[in-house]
Amino acid sequence: MDALRRLSVDQWIVYLLYGATLCIPLLPIGGNVLVILAGLLALLFDRQRFSGPLHWLQWTVLAYIIWTGISIINSVNVQWSAMSWGYHIAIYGTVYWLMTYYMNTEERRKRFLSLFCITGVLVCLGAAYQYFYMISTHIHEWVDNVHFPGLMRRMYGTLQNPNLLGEYLLFVLSIGGLGTIQALKEKDWKRCSKMGLALLIMLLCLVLTYSRGMWLSLAVTVFVAGLCVERRLLYALLVVPLVLFFYHGEVSSRLWSLFSGQDTSVMLRWALWDSTMYMVEDFPVFGIGWDAFWMTYPDYNYFIQDPTVIIYHAHNLYLHVAAETGPISLCLFLAILLGHSRNMQKGNTRGIPYRYGMTLVTVSVLVSGLFDHALYSQQVSLVLWQLLGFAMSVIRDES
């Protein structure tokens, strides 16, 4: 207790951010509470830390926050959109600003990255328990039984959806994989063996999500890592044709289905994208309103005949953001992602995870966003904004 009393406000906020890193993917309500507590402490007792000039990327983040807030005026349910904006965007902005100003030492950053990867392993352990010992009541929603009759379960864990777990694992694999490469180059065999084992666990879990979009994102992410970091990584892509040629189970069936548009999920996506484009045409400036897609879509629906089926998002990041908050908001969001990744690459003195971690995370978001909208999940988005804030802390420190 004496040690707790001696902690400064600065240290309390940092430990709350560490706790949020652990809780966001495992216990989201706990992560939200910790972020809000940290934000209140900073606002009440440490406001002076946030004074001073802002980086242009921080101004872009502010513009995105304001623009999404203004979009609420177009919502068919303004009260709902306002509450949802507070639950999502306000918390994203809070964790971004806190990470920017409190991950301000090398020791804190290393602890955060270590905890981030450890949390990924814990998520995988929980997902493994779910996969082997729990019966999913939603499997019929995630699998086309006509085209994949042998696929009886998919891994989702505490992320509550296979695609969301896949997106989260791509984030952790991007950071952890680069950390493993760094350890290999430094010949730190003990750390390399530990991280290599963790990567294998996470890769296996990613495979068991049976999420085709996330598999494709992983392949593109590995390709980019091979071009930017280590050319020998490109040989890993040879695993894909080998699996398709020699293995004929459900994994290969899902992979082959990428080249076919016959299953219902693909046909549904085409119909959703078509309807969403009409929304963008009708609301070209501020969109239909933050988190108003599921309320507005029935007016544009021509594919789903069951009125009880609710479509929460467009299964496409670009179309969904453009429809809800306008094309300008989409441009701001893309500028945030690409700007942070590009600025992180500029520091030649930084380690590999620092220089290219945000690049690989951005690639995974942009590629998976072509087929799904995993950022609709507050858990996944909060992790992304935490990483963006971490990147900004490094950018500000060196600029």
What does each of the following model-derived ranges do?
Residues W12-A20, A198-L200, Y312, N343-F371, ...:
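Loop-to-helix entry and N-terminal half of a specific, functionally important transmembrane alpha helix
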Residues L26-D46, W85-Y96, L165-L173, W215-F223, ...:
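Membrane-embedded alpha-helical segments of multi-pass membrane proteins
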Residues L125, Y131-M134, T209, A225-V266, ...:
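A membrane-periplasm/extracellular boundary helix in multi-pass inner-membrane enzymes
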Residues S260-D274, F286-T325:
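Long extracytoplasmic/lumenal interhelical loops at the membrane interface
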Residues I13-Y18, N145-T158, W270, Q305-L319:
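Juxtamembrane membrane-water interface segments that cap and precede transmembrane helices
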Residues L16-A20, A38, T94, K110-L151, ...:
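Alpha-helical transmembrane segments of multi-pass inner-membrane proteins
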Residues M1-M83, T94, N104-K110, S114-C117, ...:
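Transmembrane signal-anchor hairpin modules in multi-pass inner-membrane enzymes, especially those
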Residues L37-L43, A219, R232-A236, G357-L370, ...:
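Transmembrane alpha-helices of multi-pass inner-membrane enzymes
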